[in-house]
Swiss-Prot record:
NCBIfam families: PRK00155.1-3. Catalyzes the transfer of the cytidylyl group of CTP to D-ribitol 5-phosphate. HAMAP family: TarI. SUPFAM superfamilies: Nucleotide-diphospho-sugar transferases. This is Ribitol-5-phosphate cytidylyltransferase. The lineage of its organism: Bacteria, Bacillati, Bacillota, Bacilli, Lactobacillales. CTP binds at residues 7-10, 82-88, 113.
Length: 235
């Protein structure tokens, strides 16, 4: 089975324009989270869309699904997320297992709730690549020169941009593989390895690159929200 896991566990309101976490802010005529879920609803191979939300916001998320996506609510599960990204993925996979016991072939397409401009092509590419690889990471080529500084004051290295990519989401992998690899980490490793695909890389697994889009914006600042609103208006 193919599942989607939407990471919507953040509670930050640092934009300073609302008491709502950013995934619940309005973008056009509906919340950012709803825009994101809608993209996954369009992919018929996805059995269930599991949304990991902070415990304080579960009922709010359920109300939004009832209001904006009543025809698809049977395909959507709202569950309590974890304290960080990887524990939220773990909670999402546990919710999948509760819905239907996991098999070794079950795949989850994980995605940031605040990336509402994901395309159907990106979702399908992730699913296709995950059939033949241990994991998939969605990326775009780095367009800016990236500099490295070990002390925050002086440049210590300028890597070759031709070899660099900017990570986005989705990140896709088999549910059981993630649970096994995450479970094998020490507490210290869990603190350091906050990116799911990095766990696969560190453990020597095959992580394929899926082509992202520069429009696959992650809305984390007021400027991001302004850009996103402009993109919605143009559409």
């Amino acid at each position: 089975m193919i599942y989607a896991g939407i990471l919507a566990g953040g509670t930050g309101t640092r934009m300073g324009i609302s008491n709502l976490p950013k995934q619940f802010l309005e973008l056009g005529d509906r919340p950012i989270l709803i825009h994101t879920i809608e993209k996954f609803v369009l992919e018929p191979s996805i059995e269930k869309i599991v949304v990991g939300v902070h415990g304080d916001w579960v009922s709010h998320a359920e109300d939004l699904v009832d209001k904006y996506l009543p025809l698809y609510k049977e395909r959507i599960i709202i569950t309590k997320g974890g304290a960080d990204r990887n524990t939220s993925i773990k909670k999402i996979i546990e919710a999948i297992d509760a819905y239907r016991p996991l098999t070794p072939e079950d795949i989850v397409v994980t995605h940031d709730s605040v990336r509402p401009f994901i395309t159907l092509r990106m979702i399908q590419d992730n699913i296709q690549l995950a059939q033949n690889h241990d994991a998939v990471d969605t990326v775009v080529e780095a367009v800016d020169t990236i500099v490295e500084s070990t002390n925050g004051q002086f440049i210590t290295d300028i890597p070759n941009r031709a070899h660099l990519y900017q990570g986005q989401t989705p990140q896709t992998f088999r549910c059981k593989d993630f649970m096994d690899l995450y479970g094998s980490l020490s507490d210290e490793e869990k603190e350091i390895l906050t990116d799911a695909c990095k766990i696969f890389v560190i453990k020597g697994k095959d992580v394929a690159l899926a082509k992202g889009e520069y429009s696959n914006l992650k809305i984390t600042t007021v400027t991001d929200l302004k850009i996103a609103k402009s993109m919605i208006e143009k559409d």
